[in-house]
Every structure is written in C-alpha cells, then in structure tokens.
Amino acid sequence: MKKIAFGCDHVGFILKHEIVAHLVERGVEVIDKGTWSSERTDYPHYASQVALAVAGGEVDGGILICGTGVGISIAANKFAGIRAVVCSEPYSAQLSRQHNDTNVLAFGSRVVGLELAKMIVDAWLGAQYEGGRHQQRVEAITAIEQRRN
C-alpha cells in the first residue's frame, strides 16, 4: 500500500504521530484524517473519515487508533466495502491481509506500545492478499454486506 488514510481519537493522538513518521520513512503517503490534538473527541467521526477514503478509492488502505482499537474498528466496519481488523500482534495483522483482504487496520494505544505498533503496521503493510481458497470467503462476506445494505 502506497497511500494510507490515518485517523484516531484523542487517546491515539500521540501514537498516531509516531506511526505516521514511521510510515513516511517507509515511503508511504499518509492522508491525516484527524484528530489533530489530544482534546477529547469521539472515534466514530474519524473512523468514518478513514472508511470513506478507503471505500471511495482515495487511498489504498486505512489505519485507525483509539484506546483499544475495538470501537473504532466497529465504526469503520459499518461502511460498505470496509474490512477492518483490530490487531494487537503482527501475526494476525499479516494473516488478516493474506486471508481476509483487510483494508483497514486498527489497534489500541492503551494496548500496544510504539515498537509493537510499528511491527503490527509493518506486518500488515508487507502482506499481500493471497486470493485462491480465501476468495470464496471474502465474496461470502461481501454478499452478506450487500444483503444488509
């Protein structure tokens, strides 16, 4: 992924800056969807901004941070075409791309520290969707999404 939308709430604000710097060092273009301060805010807004950018093709994928990664990933998954995963270790991040074709990664700043967050991001960005036997399952998820909408 060459272009990423990034969003967080106030809890993820400090970690976001560190991860954005890490991404830029790797040559990834980052579109910052907020928040831009540590003042209290609500994560659904930032999940929405990132999900819309991903679903609309503005970016290749998205990264979200809140306290645990759970709430912000739930909000992102409400958008058609979004397959957001919350990860607290690199192996799940890698497999989520390889097997589930995830396009949004979420994690919690209260759960992972900076070095682990970098490892999770690197594993996710470094993995490619394998298709094959996994394609049928991804298509089944998309069919559920289409029936719901």
Swiss-Prot record:
- What's an example GO BP annotation here? pentose-phosphate shunt, non-oxidative branch
Catalytic center at which residues? Answer: C66, H99
- This protein's record includes keyword Acyltransferase: no
The positions making up the signal sequence are none
- Which catalytic reaction applies to this protein? aldehydo-D-ribose 5-phosphate = D-ribulose 5-phosphate; D-allose 6-phosphate = D-allulose 6-phosphate
For this protein, the record's Gene3D superfamilies field holds: Sugar-phosphate isomerase, RpiB/LacA/LacB (3.40.1400.10)
Q: What is its EC number?
A: 5.3.1.6
Q: Which Pfam families match?
A: LacAB_rpiB
Its function, per the record, reads: Catalyzes the interconversion of ribulose-5-P and ribose-5-P. It probably also has activity on D-allose 6-phosphate.
Name of this chain's protein: Ribose-5-phosphate isomerase B
Q: Which species does this protein come from?
A: Escherichia coli (strain K12)
